[in-house]
Amino acid sequence: MLKEVKIELTNKCSRNCKHCSSNATSRIGNLKILDFEDVSRIIKEAKLMGADTIVFTGGEPLMYDRLPELVELTSKLGMKSTIYTFAYRTDETLNKYRQLIDLGLNKIVYSLADSLSDEEDISVDDKVEFFDKVFENNNLRLGFHYTVSKDSFSRLESGVTETIETFKSRSYFDRVSLLRFVPHGKGTTDMDLSKEELLAIKNLYLNSNDKDKIRLGTPWNILGIENTPCIIADEIMIIGFDGIAYPCDSIKYFTKLGISGNIRENSLMEMYNSEYFSNIRKFNTDNSCSTCEQYPICKSGCIGQKIIANYTESEDKVLTLKRCINSRDPKCMR
């Protein structure tokens, strides 16, 4: 059952992060943006399908001029709204966040990708003083995203620990979510993590005194710590800035095994019930790893990672999809 729809409103962003899964850009000639009327319709259809959360992302969602109207619409429909953002911490950004809060925004998730951005940080405030001002006199929640790649691995422990120590006394702070790097978008295979680095991440989590402030999620099931059920093509949908609905963030803009449809031509329900989404749900069951003692926790790993790692061109896309899902995670810890 659908619970959350993420909408990449635009690919416009000033940060130019080297790991960006959406190939976000500031180049005028390459900018893409979703039509406001199409997005509004998708939000209304999400409500009819029982979804309770809309996530606005990008690119940088603050660069979408009519974002305030979309947040207000989401709130009036009785759904929660979240933005994934990495805007520079300036007075202009502060005012935009405060406007969205006044219109019903529920949560801000801010990126900790400072070390992965190629652009000069023109932020005026540090994170603490900035977010103290953002969350003054409201009940909004703040989360952070830290994408763990080979390029950001060296700063992982200090970055996560310092963030938690700094913000855990703030009532508005939720958690730091560790995002497993996927070699797609701008990200390249040489940025992928080794098994040794994955084990170090496991030890970091297990040795932390603030586990309740760290979110791992399904892609980290391979570490054998806990199982978080995979919700690909089921509880979640991602609308790309190209209008296509994708089953998961891990395989955004990957269309070699099927396309669900496009919001310019299809309803949300049609895309959710498309052959592509339906096959993913059907194949996401017990597979060749089911006899492994780690299977109850690992569940053979991340479907998106498996598809990207194991895809080979074939005329039979359904069979190829099944083979990829039935394979082991490329970073299987066995």
Question: Model-flagged regions — what are they?
Answer:
Residues R15, Y246, S300:
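Glycine-centered loop/turn positions within well-structured domains
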Residues M1-K107:
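Conserved alpha-helical substructure of the radical SAM core
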Residues I33-E37, D121-D125, F283:
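Conserved phosphate-coordination/catalytic loops
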Residues M1, N23, K252-R334:
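Flexible mid-to-C-terminal extensions adjoining Fe-S/redox cofactors in radical SAM and related proteins
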Residues T25, G59, A113, F181, ...:
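Flexible loop residues that form catalytic
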Residues G29, K80, Q99-Y246, S250-S260, ...:
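Radical SAM enzyme [4Fe-4S]-AdoMet core and its adjacent flexible, acidic
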